[in-house]
Swiss-Prot record:
Keyword Transferase: yes
Top EC class for this record: transferase
Gene: hisC1
InterPro entries: Aminotrans_II_pyridoxalP_BS, Aminotransferase_I/II_large, HisP_aminotrans, HistidinolP_aminotransfase, PyrdxlP-dep_Trfase, PyrdxlP-dep_Trfase_major, PyrdxlP-dep_Trfase_small
Annotated family: Belongs to the class-II pyridoxal-phosphate-dependent aminotransferase family. Histidinol-phosphate aminotransferase subfamily.
Any one biological process term the GO annotation gives: L-histidine biosynthetic process
Organism this protein belongs to: Hydrogenovibrio crunogenus (strain DSM 25203 / XCL-2)
Residues bearing PTM N6-(pyridoxal phosphate)lysine: K210
Protein name per Swiss-Prot or TrEMBL: Histidinol-phosphate aminotransferase 1
Amino acid sequence: MSQYWSQLVHTLTPYVPGEQPKVDNLIKLNTNESPYPPSPLVLNALSSQLNDKLRLYPDPSSEDLKQSIATYYGVESNQVFVGNGSDEVLAHAFMTLLKQDKPILFPDISYSFYPVYCGLYEIEHQTIPLTDDFKINPADYNIENGGIIFPNPNAPTGRLLPLQAIEQIVQQNASSVVVVDEAYIDFGGESAAQLVLRYPNLLVVQTFSKSRALAGLRVGFAIGDKALIDGLERVKNSFNSYPLDRLATAGAIAAIEDEPYFQQSCEKIITTRDTLTHFLEDNGFEVIPSAANFVFTRHSEMRAEDIANQLREQAIIVRYFNKPRIDQYLRITIGTEEENTQLCRALTDILKTQNA
């Protein structure tokens, strides 16, 4: 705390990112990173950028990347916005589209960065409770609002909202913007990006961090009506005209181009997720149906925090949330098959000790 802080800084409650321990031989299942490396095409693309052009600023519009994303999703490049990770894209969306004279809406159990943005930009918000089984009810969002945002699949629950339900929310809120945060959509869902051509109030945000294994490069993007994108560009260019460096841009383009590798990685993660889900359900855990690269689970007889602590003793880190409604749940990132096997062995040992 400092006497030189502005009044706003004193009111902020910053986002707390998942732990990034600097320890070798650790099974890290707490931040939903890909267990697999980036495509070889990405590594080649990065190497090709290590030359004297690094002395020059990158393209401020990242036009080549926008065109690659537009082609992939069947939209025009002027319907694509890119940023330094989807968190930056979301931050610009809050400032550009959600700072209105009415409260914005988002689920009570959701991405914990949303209330942080509201605090930073002084945006009034209202949380809408999920159902008892952690579902979003579209009818609950048919109230007066200054905008709506939610992840799909939701985080940290992993539940998927069907495309038809998303369309219902967008239709019944034609006078405000609906932002769908699709960080995990590639692990079992259908992207709402296909709806942006029909709905000018829909913005879809995605990231290269999860399914394309580029969390270390920080590349995110949004797809929406040209008018929405124009607004995002105005805010971006009032903040940082060069959010993506040359390496990040080249790596992201290469990741899009290697579709077979992308599909193979997603399929392996989905298969391992199914294997882990079956194991957990066979051993006294309740598992929320997941369409993400993680599972959200609780045990009928053991406290979630105790399980997390005992896993840590075996060099396995999972995510525990000390928050109302979810303080008995763990979020477990899907690792490699080998990591999954070690996790299951560790859980088996913990449960045996509990039942001894």
